Amino acid sequence: MNRQDHGPAAVQTLRWREGRLEMIDQRVLPARFEYLPFTSAAEVAEGIRSMVVRGAPAIGCAAAYGVALESVQLRGATREAFAVGLQRGFDVLAASRPTAVNLFWALARMRAVWDANQHRAVGDIVDCLLAQAHEISADDVRINRAMGAYGAALLADGARVLTHCNAGALATAGHGTALGVIRSAVQAGKRISVIADETRPFLQGARLTAWEMVQENIPVTLITDNMAGHLMSRGEVDAIVVGTDRVAANGDVANKIGTYMVAVLAQRHNIPFYVACPLSTIDLAIPDGAAIPIEERAAEEVTGFRDCQWAAKGVQVRNPAFDVTPAELVTALITERGVLRQPNRTTIAGLFAT
């Protein structure tokens, strides 16, 4: 198999077809592989909220297309009605999920295009917004490949790499962030094997990461989240690479719940802990991790699945979707501009000064 041309690395998590957005329904993988159609901002927002699409970069791309879809729906409207309707689309998308900063970054890019073209005819604005959504998606793939090249150099031939959640092609417009690093290392000829945390409660590691790796014949071993420390203590993990949904100005990292636990264990066992992080995921307006909003999801994700209930009825549940890993536990951020070791407020600000 040519890994550059087949498998999830080439799968389009989002695609524009015949005037509508289609997204892989990640809730039903790996049992079924199917695309769902979306024709409005409200539909895309619900797709984000219900986890049809997930992963910070993919959410950002979806939101951009959501704005474009809303503008397409309004192509025949008056200028005033177009403005009201498009603003409604921005609002519903912004309210879909609070933690992934790429959502707001992409909406800001779309709004900048709208602001710069308000003097033009409505049809021209629609064309500009759709072009920008396509550009955001293409940029994401380019950035992921750049990060992958930088990150691949950090992994030794034969490395056993543990990852948490899914930061692969499915979480982006293509190639992936954390899994993009692994893909790039494999494409460079390195023998890499993956240890995938199952990532309770939504099982992104078991359902999505394991699927991506199996499809590409990259060796992968699935473990439950509470096995990670045991494997580290036995010397069976050489490096950890994860993605992120938001990085604060001081380098604190918000990622899928359980990441903090993995980082603490990595420090205890002297294992490098890398975070694959496009610059669009760094939020300089957030001073530190304590200020990052953490989404709390439904109790039903923890107590059971569909018709199977494994927890006692009436039990109280906490279900934060993310946690924060302090910057001092991060060996390096892997960005499209290079590897930033021991990230802090000064070095992160420097990334944006170049």
From Swiss-Prot:
Domain of life: Bacteria
InterPro entries: IF-2B-related, IF-M1Pi, IF_2B-like_C, Initiation_fac_2B_a/b/d, M1Pi_N, NagB/RpiA_transferase-like
Keyword NADP: no
Reactions performed catalytically: 5-(methylsulfanyl)-alpha-D-ribose 1-phosphate = 5-(methylsulfanyl)-D-ribulose 1-phosphate
Pathway: Amino-acid biosynthesis; L-methionine biosynthesis via salvage pathway; L-methionine from S-methyl-5-thio-alpha-D-ribose 1-phosphate: step 1/6
Summary of the function given for this chain in its UniProt record: Catalyzes the interconversion of methylthioribose-1-phosphate (MTR-1-P) into methylthioribulose-1-phosphate (MTRu-1-P).
The protein, known as: Methylthioribose-1-phosphate isomerase
Organism field: Albidiferax ferrireducens (strain ATCC BAA-621 / DSM 15236 / T118) (Rhodoferax ferrireducens)
